[in-house]
From Swiss-Prot:
Protein name: UPF0178 protein VSAL_I0701
Family as reported in the entry's similarity comment: Belongs to the UPF0178 family.
HAMAP family: UPF0178 (MF_00489)
Origin: domain of life: Bacteria
One Pfam family hit: DUF188
Species of the source: Aliivibrio salmonicida (strain LFI1238) (Vibrio salmonicida (strain LFI1238))
InterPro entries: UPF0178
């Protein structure tokens, strides 16, 4: 299993958790962004900088990821596309998107886009809380434990 990170909007604390997990497990992790993302010097941790542009990093993740990989992203349309490829998607708040939940998430996202387009101020997501950080780390550990059992 390879871990891919949609690093353009990934919180720093989540990146730190991921780097510690990669160091501990030896799994390959790749941060993909349209800007430079500094990563620790380790053979299994790398960063790919893609061109600037709408969804360029997302497209690179879709192109490179394979069934069984894990992607860290809060981008719901990207998650939907990856789930079709049988790629696991975990958001930075610790929610694992699934075939059963992604359609509802897409509908909510589209509804909020429609509201914003009509001039209604919907606000953005809340800042990442300590509970979110803990839930992300716990969910990541559960996923990695399952991978370890299959190796």
């Amino acid at each position: 299993m390879q871990i891919w990170v949609d690093a353009d909007a990934c919180p720093k604390v989540v990146k730190e958790v991921l780097c510690r997990a990669a160091t501990r497990t030896g799994l390959q992790i790749t941060f993909v962004a349209n800007h430079y993302v500094p990563v620790p010097t380790a053979p299994n941790i790398k960063s790919i900088q893609v061109e600037s542009g709408f969804d360029v990093a997302d497209d690179e993740i879709v192109r490179r990821s394979e069934a069984g990989d894990l992607v860290i992203s809060g981008d719901i349309p990207l998650a939907a596309e990856l789930i079709e490829k049988k790629v696991q998607v975990l958001n930075p708040r610790g929610e694992l998107y699934t075939e059963a939940t992604i359609k509802a998430r897409l509908n909510i996202r589209d509804f909020m886009d429609t509201m914003r387009a009509s001039g209604i101020q919907t606000g953005g997501p809340a800042a990442l809380s300590q509970t979110d950080r803990r839930e992300f780390a716990n969910q990541l550990d559960r996923i990695l434990a399952k991978v370890k059992k299959t190796i």
